[in-house]
Every structure is written in structure tokens, then in C-alpha cells.
């Protein structure tokens, strides 16, 4: 134990500033922050669902995602120095920096100058529900808002098509898949 000038007694091995953390510790912190964000999102949703029902919860969730996905895309673009209109390369880069990317397993394939397919191979929310014996969460209507507005924020020319997303039947190794196409 030591006494700091402010009179705070600390155990030196537990006091640390973010700026002093190693790369591995910072990546762990980012993963924890992503998990915390998702836990809050889930708890908020369940609270609304319990009080007002699933339809109201889904409606409010869509409304929140309409705003959040744009904020997230803009912040990622600013952090990476990406200007709007960057097409497929900008979208692929930004998808890697979403909060989901730190806690889910995802991939981008079928990449061309005008099209790509994004797949969520492991989804923390859906896999938790599966472990609890619950049915797939029907997130398609929210996902359509989330992914289409995320892509349009990066490049307004994007058209987004849902290839599969619960409640749709899906393969065991893909929870959802989205096709992004640049229109002329």
C-alpha cells in the first residue's frame, strides 16, 4: 500500500491508467467495452419487452438503430480518415471497426468493385439464446435498418439486401448475411 499526494490509499498492483496499458491489454479493454455495450443493449431491450411487449421493443430498437448505426459509421470514418463515397473498400474497412467486430466472428466475401457479401458466422446474442434454449431472436427488421444505414453513411450509393437473417432459416455457420451493391 502507498499513499498518493491526494491522500488516496491504493494497492499499487491494481492502479493503472489506460495510457499505460499494453496493446494486448487495450485490445482486451476494447473487447470488454464491446461486451458491455451489447449487454446494456440486451438489458434495455428486455426491460422494454417485459413492460410493453415484443412489438413495442422491436419498434423502439429499430428507432434507436436508425440513429446509432449512423453515429457509429461516422465515428469509425473519422477515426480512420475515410471520406464518404469510398465504395466497397471503405465499407469493408469500416465493418472491421464496428463494436460487433470485437465480439462476433464475421467475414466479407465475394468482393468486387461494386459488390460484397458480409456474413455473421458467430453472433454473441444468438448463441447466448441458443445456450439458454431460446429460439433465434428475429432481428431481421432491425438488421435491415442497421446495415442499410451503416452502408449508406459510408457511401450513399450503397443498396443493401438481406440474404438471410432470423427469423429466416439459416445454415449452422451463418446467422445473417448481407449483400452490399453500389448503384451507379
Where is each model-derived feature located?
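N-terminal accessory segment detector
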Residues: 2-117, 122-142, 152-175, 183-184
Amino acid at each position: 500500500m502507498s499513499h498518493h499526494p491526494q491522500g488516496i490509499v491504493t494497492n499499487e498492483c491494481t492502479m493503472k491508467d489506460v495510457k499505460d496499458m499494453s496493446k494486448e491489454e487495450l485490445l482486451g479493454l476494447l473487447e470488454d467495452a464491446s461486451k458491455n455495450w451489447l449487454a446494456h443493449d440486451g438489458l434495455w431491450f428486455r426491460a422494454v419487452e417485459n413492460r410493453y411487449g415484443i412489438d413495442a421493443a422491436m419498434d423502439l430498437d429499430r428507432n434507436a438503430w436508425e440513429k446509432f448505426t449512423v453515429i457509429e459509421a461516422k465515428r469509425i470514418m473519422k477515426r480512420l480518415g475515410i471520406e464518404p463515397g469510398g465504395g466497397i473498400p471503405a465499407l469493408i474497412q469500416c465493418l472491421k471497426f464496428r463494436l460487433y467486430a470485437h465480439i462476433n466472428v464475421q467475414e466479407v466475401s465475394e468482393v468486387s468493385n461494386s459488390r460484397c457479401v458480409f456474413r455473421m458466422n458467430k453472433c454473441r446474442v444468438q448463441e447466448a439464446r441458443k445456450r439458454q434454449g431460446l429460439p433465434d431472436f428475429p432481428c431481421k427488421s432491425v438488421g435491415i435498418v442497421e446495415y442499410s444505414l451503416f452502408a449508406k453513411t459510408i457511401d450513399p450509393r450503397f443498396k443493401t439486401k438481406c440474404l438471410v437473417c432470423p427469423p429466416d432459416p439459416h445454415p449452422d455457420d451463418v446467422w445473417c448475411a448481407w449483400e452490399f451493391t453500389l448503384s451507379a
